């Protein structure tokens, strides 16, 4: 919770968000941001291990899971575990950021424009990776994007907002075929040119 909501309630695991201890809530949530926030003085392995260490995971389990996840995203553990963030490309940094967000099996993954600064090839690769990881780990993912092609590719359901208000929540197919109003229709028409 960065900002308290002004109206209504948001529930997570049948409990109102405002009733959670903030630390408990944060440890159940993974974050991937547009600005890749790796700690520059920590190795790839140390960056990935931060949350599991806070949750008192076994050291051996952390190492094994880190190596396994690195392999899953195409980063050979032998070559990447001990590298510093400055030695990685933008796409590699974002992969590490994603792994750090999911290694402790969060219930919710929040992704805020995570691919907007990447080249087109890295962007497509990471979109595919997110779909694969989402299906494998079965976590709820809240993905913020202004890229309608990206939303259509990645989302099970899309929430369209206008001036902070919900205009429509629907599957990508329903949004395309039956937009709630002209704003939604134009929004998706512009995104699909």
Question: Which residues does each predicted region cover?
Answer:
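Catalytic Walker B motif of ABC-type/P-loop ATPase nucleotide-binding domains
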Residues: 109-112
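Conserved ABC ATPase signature
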Residues: 83-88, 92
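Conserved catalytic motifs of ABC-family nucleotide-binding domains
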Residues: 105
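Short helical segment in ABC ATPase nucleotide-binding domains corresponding to the A-loop/adjacent helical element
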Residues: 45-53, 63, 67
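Conserved ABC transporter NBD signature motif
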Residues: 8-16, 25
């Amino acid at each position: 919770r960065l900002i308290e909501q002004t109206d209504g309630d948001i529930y997570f695991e049948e409990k109102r968000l405002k009733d959670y201890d903030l630390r408990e809530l944060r440890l159940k949530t993974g974050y991937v941001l547009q600005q890749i926030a790796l700690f520059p003085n920590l190795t790839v392995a140390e960056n990935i291990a931060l949350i599991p260490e806070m949750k008192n995971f076994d050291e051996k389990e952390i190492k094994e899971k880190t190596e396994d996840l690195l392999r899953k995203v195409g980063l050979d553990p032998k070559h990447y575990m001990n590298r510093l963030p400055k030695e990685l490309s933008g796409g590699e940094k974002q992969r590490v950021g994603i792994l750090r967000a999911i290694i402790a099996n969060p219930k919710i993954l929040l992704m805020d424009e995570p691919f907007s600064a990447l080249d087109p090839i890295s962007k497509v690769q990471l979109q595919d990776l997110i779909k694969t990881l989402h299906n494998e780990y079965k976590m709820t993912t809240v993905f913020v994007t202004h890229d309608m092609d990206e939303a259509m590719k990645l989302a099970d359901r899309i929430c369209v907002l206008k001036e902070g208000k919900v205009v429509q929540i629907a599957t990508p197919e329903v949004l395309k075929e039956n937009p709630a109003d002209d704003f939604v229709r134009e929004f998706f028409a512009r995104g699909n040119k």
